């Protein structure tokens, strides 16, 4: 059994997310977070011979699984890289508009459960945390050079950790004596500086989340890909996003709201909302969360939220089209 296959992964909101795409047999779809291919395989089962599925992932282990799938199914195209390169990657594959795009954000179970990746404080391993281990600075490398203020801001903003300043100060003091290069070392520093304990949560949880999000630019990539998808969706095409914490869900929620709902008009306005131009997105249903049965089978699904939007015939504001070029 390969390293890519040794860690069990249960796809969250599998049917709900793929149902939300309303897959057409001859459609072109994007799975922006392939992982181990749970969503992708269900999409493929609903595509006909003329359909196409493009999958993205940063993780070399996930890409190995995706490439194996692509060898046996010519409808699949594989992109090794972050989904922030959405439009550039599609251009390179000769693809214009798409019928739907799905994103299952955050970290996957295989990444958490593979102790060697350095994502989890449950294992003593090198402090890496990169989703793409072939490029970029590891968590240990960043912690070794970051200023106390930068450490504080990352832990506070991305981990919503109220003891961020104490933790940052302790990290700087400890690294002056010896490198903080393993998950256990970082977890111990955090535990010594978090004064209160949250029920059912390790004191290192928020700090590890914060460093991981920063190292992988997770929130920036979410903010970057959404306008690109909006520009590439055909009329009637669907965007489905599964988020696992409030920071990324807030980005998705605010984006969809901005492009699906007009700002309230002042009472003195001489125009009615019904007379305003159609906006480029419309919200499809309510945000969905896993049911009790799914949470019982997979406790990691507890915090998942699925939001869905559909492309309308409404024009896309020029400023949104310009923003996409920043990541091309």
UniProtKB/Swiss-Prot annotation:
Keyword ATP-binding: no
Domain of life, per lineage: Bacteria
Subcellular location(s) per record: Cytoplasm
EC number(s) recorded for this UniProt protein: 2.1.1.199
Main location: cytoplasm
Membrane spanning residue stretches: none
Residues annotated to bind S-adenosyl-L-methionine: 37-39, 57, 83, 104, 111
Gene3D superfamilies in alphabetical order: Putative methyltransferase TM0872, insert domain, Vaccinia Virus protein VP39
Pfam family, one: Methyltransf_5
Any one biological process term the GO annotation gives: rRNA base methylation
Single GO molecular function: rRNA (cytosine-N4-)-methyltransferase activity
Catalytic activity: cytidine(1402) in 16S rRNA + S-adenosyl-L-methionine = N(4)-methylcytidine(1402) in 16S rRNA + S-adenosyl-L-homocysteine + H(+)
Alphabetized UniProt keyword annotations: Cytoplasm, Methyltransferase, rRNA processing, S-adenosyl-L-methionine, Transferase
SUPFAM superfamilies for this protein: Putative methyltransferase TM0872, insert domain, S-adenosyl-L-methionine-dependent methyltransferases
GO cellular component: cytoplasm
Family under the similarity heading: Belongs to the methyltransferase superfamily. RsmH family.
Function: Specifically methylates the N4 position of cytidine in position 1402 (C1402) of 16S rRNA.
Protein name: Ribosomal RNA small subunit methyltransferase H
Organism of this sequence: Neisseria meningitidis serogroup B (strain ATCC BAA-335 / MC58)
Lineage of origin: Bacteria, Pseudomonadati, Pseudomonadota, Betaproteobacteria, Neisseriales
């Amino acid at each position: 059994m390969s390293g890519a296959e040794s860690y069990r992964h249960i796809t969250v909101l599998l049917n709900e997310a793929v149902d939300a795409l309303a897959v057409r047999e001859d459609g072109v779809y994007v799975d922006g977070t392939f992982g181990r291919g749970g969503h992708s395989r269900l999409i493929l089962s609903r595509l006909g011979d003329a359909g196409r599925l493009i999958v993205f992932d940063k993780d070399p282990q996930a890409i190995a699984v995706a490439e194996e799938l692509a060898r046996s199914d010519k409808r699949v195209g594989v992109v090794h890289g972050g989904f922030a390169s959405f439009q550039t990657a599609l251009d390179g594959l000769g693809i214009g508009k798409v019928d739907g795009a799905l994103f299952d954000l955050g970290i996957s179970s295989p990444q958490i459960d593979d102790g060697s990746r350095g994502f989890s404080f449950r294992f003593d391993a090198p402090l890496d945390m990169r989703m793409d281990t072939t490029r970029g600075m590891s968590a240990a490398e960043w912690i070794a050079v970051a200023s106390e203020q930068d450490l504080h801001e990352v832990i506070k903003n991305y981990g919503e950790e109220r003891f961020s300043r104490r933790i940052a100060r302790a990290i700087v003091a400890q690294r002056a004596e010896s490198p903080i290069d393993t998950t256990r070392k970082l977890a111990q520093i955090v535990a010594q500086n978090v004064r209160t304990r949250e029920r059912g949560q390790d004191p290192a949880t928020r700090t590890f989340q914060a460093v991981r999000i920063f190292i992988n630019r997770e929130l920036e990539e979410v903010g970057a890909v959404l306008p690109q998808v909006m520009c590439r969706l055909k009329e009637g095409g669907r965007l489905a996003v599964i988020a696992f914490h409030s920071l990324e869900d807030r980005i998705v929620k605010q984006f969809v709201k901005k492009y699906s709902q007009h700002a309230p008009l002042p009472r003195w306005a001489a125009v009615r909302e019904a007379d305003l131009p159609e906006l480029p997105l419309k919200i499809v249903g309510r945000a969905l969360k896993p049911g009790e049965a799914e949470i019982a089978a997979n406790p990691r699904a507890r915090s998942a939220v699925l939001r869905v939007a559909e492309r309308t015939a409404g024009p896309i504001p020029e400023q949104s089209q310009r923003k996409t070029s920043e990541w091309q």
